[in-house]
């Protein structure tokens, strides 16, 4: 595997006024796809990382915090998730976590950028861990908006929809998938007891974008839970918003979460019943402005 030696530095934007300086020791690939610049590099503090348009999307040393927190609260809240739709998640780690649940019969991953998927297959094996080749997995290279409309027209149904997209403010690719009207479409794809979960960027640096996503979920789902997890390679806490048509994720006890994980054969590094309780109990972060 060819690589360009470092060290060099990545200036990763946190907001329009702040940034994270990341030391890069080696670069494996730099590629411009139709939609974005794709970089895979070895970083000093975070290990190998997938970087899209100067934003770290996933890194070996901390991606489990992001992906386990995105996937398992919703999957554990549903008593028997069989059909799961993933929008985004090109590196395959979200798919990997979904497929840990023995209840899953079908996991459809839809990503607009096939180049990201191919780069991940070759350069990020620890991310996907063979998930792309699982017989339950179906990888579709298509705009998520188009796929959802097509699935709606076909009458397809899912138990859980997981939105692992780029931030609503970092690029134009995914913006329409965060709009209130899109969450209404997602609701139409779900069975009567279905759930959706989306990452929603950061509520501290980008409160307006976060509130837009929150409004979209609340407009279509009767039960909504907000939670966040600190991701070191991002330099901030990532926010998640979970919408449910029937089950309340905040009502699950740690014992019930652990029982469901155990019965489904799910092994995790970070997420557990105790973690679930913590995620659902702590407030999100916003700027506290004092005069």
From Swiss-Prot:
Family: Belongs to the spermidine/spermine synthase family.
Active site: 164
Metabolic or biological pathway: Amine and polyamine biosynthesis; spermidine biosynthesis; spermidine from putrescine: step 1/1
EC category name: transferase
Native organism: Pyrobaculum neutrophilum (strain DSM 2338 / JCM 9278 / NBRC 100436 / V24Sta)
Binding-site residues for S-methyl-5'-thioadenosine, renumbered to this chain: 36, 111, 143-144
Keywords associated with the record: Cytoplasm, Polyamine biosynthesis, Spermidine biosynthesis, Transferase
Protein name: Polyamine aminopropyltransferase
Gene behind this protein: speE
GO MF annotations, alphabetized: spermidine synthase activity; thermospermine synthase activity
GO biological process: spermidine biosynthetic process
Compartment annotation: Cytoplasm
Listed InterPro entries: PABS (IPR030374), PABS_CS (IPR030373), SAM-dependent_MTases_sf (IPR029063), Spermi_synthase (IPR001045), Spermidine_synt_N (IPR035246), Spermidine_synt_N_sf (IPR037163)
Assembly behavior: Homodimer or homotetramer.
């Amino acid at each position: 595997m060819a690589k360009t030696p470092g060290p060099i530095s990545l200036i990763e934007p946190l907001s329009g006024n702040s940034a994270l300086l990341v030391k890069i020791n080696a670069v494996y690939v730099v590629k411009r796809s139709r939609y974005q610049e794709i970089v895979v590099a070895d970083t000093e503090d975070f290990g190998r990382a997938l970087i899209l348009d100067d934003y770290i999307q996933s890194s070996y040393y901390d991606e489990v915090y992001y992906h386990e927190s995105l996937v398992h609260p919703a999957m554990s809240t549903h008593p028997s998730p069989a059909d799961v739709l993933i929008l985004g998640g090109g590196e395959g780690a979200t798919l990997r976590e979904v497929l840990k649940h023995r209840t899953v019969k079908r996991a459809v991953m839809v990503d607009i950028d096939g180049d990201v998927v191919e780069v991940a297959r070759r350069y990020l094996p620890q991310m996907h861990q063979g998930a792309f080749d699982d017989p339950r997995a179906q990888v579709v290279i298509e705009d998520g908006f188009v796929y959802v409309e097509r699935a709606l027209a076909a009458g397809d149904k899912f138990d859980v929809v997981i939105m692992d997209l780029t931030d609503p403010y970092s690029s134009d690719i995914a913006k329409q998938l965060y709009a209130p009207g899109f969450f209404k479409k997602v609701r139409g794809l779900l069975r009567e007891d279905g759930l959706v979960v989306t990452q929603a960027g950061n509520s501290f640096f980008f409160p307006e974008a976060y509130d837009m996503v929150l409004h979209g979920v609340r407009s279509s789902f009767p039960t909504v839970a907000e939670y966040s997890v600190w991701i070191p390679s991002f330099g901030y806490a990532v926010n998640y918003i979970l919408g449910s048509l029937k089950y309340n994720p905040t009502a699950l006890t740690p014992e019930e979460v652990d029982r469901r994980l155990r019965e489904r054969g799910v092994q995790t590094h970070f997420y557990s019943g105790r973690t679930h309780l913590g995620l659902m109990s702590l407030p999100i972060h916003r700027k506290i402005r004092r005069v």
